[in-house]
Design a protein with these regions (language model features):
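Fe(II)/2-oxoglutarate oxygenase catalytic core
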Residues: 69, 73-75, 79-81, 85-271, ...
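A short beta-strand-loop-beta hairpin characteristic of the jelly-roll/cupin
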Residues: 299-317
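Short coil turns that delineate tetratricopeptide repeat
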Residues: 24, 57-58, 92
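Canonical positions in the second alpha-helix
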Residues: 18-19, 52-53, 86-87
Length: 377
């Protein structure tokens, strides 16, 4: 110890090496041996000593940082990443104390990991580009996987707030070409847009999407009773809204093409959903994962977006967005005019006819329990 403190690394290493076998109840001074070897420039001997020490003290911060630095010098980037990540994890544990001398080593580790992630990301993206799968749905999913691998994105899964049906694919968005019936609805977009515009011009029929009820606690939603997010109900609680439906015959006819659930007191459900400029629907989860939500854009100004899970898409006139609202999702209008979509729900396509019938019976039984639908859409 005295020789090491005096800067005589050679003497220190020689004397400490005599103690490698240790003694009963006294462990070998592997960390000191490693420090002496490192000062001598003998990285190989330092690594051996640190490996012995970390076997007994796997979360010793100083030893982890020393080993990481040795791996960097030795060109073993992946090993260095592992030791630096373990060290940073140990440093952030509750109650962890960090000696001042280790702080620069921790900062060096953070910088190394950031640079390493950048290099690794570029390598993976180049590999994906070389496969020719960089575009389209397959490419998007590969890039999402890379983002998860590199920690650039959080993992989102179905988290319905009321009812979870197991075994369904964890997909945030579905693609238009998966639904043959959708073309018939999209063909009616010009007529539906005219009907929605007429409803807006009449200033009647729209009401806040999230409403308070006198016999329930107020919803914990910042847009509660706020007309900036409004709904023009065409179907509500399984029944057509007569006055509104009569004003929108083309829309009502178009909805007949969709596989909308028919559940007493609950579905069909269909609305014009209006979002005014500057309005942001905060992240939230839907109640069920047995349905998909369809947005048929009727008025789709620039500056609007929908994030479902880790993926963000924009509305384009006439191009339906289909998504699983049991994933965390949010929407915003940063444009200069209102965004209006035709919103309705459909069965998940994976559900068999038998499962759909059973779920219909189950949801109706749930709603009969107190005579009130838990989810009206």
């Amino acid at each position: 110890m005295a020789a090491l403190r005096a800067g005589d690394a050679g003497t220190a290493f020689a004397r400490l090496s005599l103690l490698k076998e240790g003694a009963p109840g006294i462990p070998a001074p592997w960390l000191l041996i490693a420090q002496a070897a490192e000062r001598l420039g003998d990285d190989a001997e330092a690594e051996v000593a640190l490996a012995h020490y970390l076997k007994d003290e796997p979360r010793h911060l100083g030893a982890l940082l020393m080993m990481a630095a040795l791996k960097v010098r030795g060109g073993d980037e992946r090993a260095a990443q592992t030791f630096y990540r373990t060290a940073l994890g140990a440093a952030t544990q509750p109650g962890a104390t960090i000696a001042p001398v280790l702080v620069p080593m921790l900062r060096a580790g953070e910088a190394f990991l950031a640079a390493s992630t950048t290099r690794f990301s570029a390598h993976l993206e180049a590999a994906v580009d070389a496969t020719g799968l960089a575009d389209g749905v397959a490419g998007a999913r590969i890039r999402q996987a890379i983002d998860l691998l590199l920690g650039r994105s959080d993992l989102f899964v179905q988290q319905p707030s009321m009812f979870y049906f197991p075994g369904l694919a964890q997909r945030s968005f579905f693609e238009r070409d998966e639904f043959a019936w959708l073309a018939s609805i999209e063909a009616a977009v010009p007529a539906m847009r005219a009907e929605a515009s007429a409803a807006m011009a009449a200033h009647t029929g729209f009401e806040p999407y999230v409403r308070s009820s006198p016999d329930r606690p107020p919803p914990a939603n910042p847009l509660r009773d706020d007309p900036n997010w409004s709904a023009f109900h065409l179907w509500q609680g399984g029944l057509p809204v007569a006055d509104n439906a009569a004003r929108c015959p083309a829309t009502m006819a178009a909805l007949d093409h969709a596989p909308i659930p028919v559940i007493a007191g609950r579905s069909p459900m269909a609305i014009y959903s209006l979002l005014t400029p500057g309005t942001h629907i905060q992240p939230h989860h839907g109640l069920l994962n047995t349905r998909l939500i369809c947005h048929v854009p009727l008025i789709a100004p620039a500056g609007c977006g929908l994030r479902v899970g880790a993926e963000t898409r924009t509305w384009r006139p006439g191009e339906t967005l289909i998504f699983d609202d049991s994933f965390e999702h949010e929407a915003w209008n940063r444009g200069t005019e209102a965004r209006v979509v035709l919103l309705f729900e459909i069965w998940r396509p994976e559900l068999t006819a038998t499962e759909r019938a059973a779920l219909t019976d189950l949801f109706e039984a749930i709603d009969r329990y107190q005579g009130v639908a838990i989810d009206a859409g």
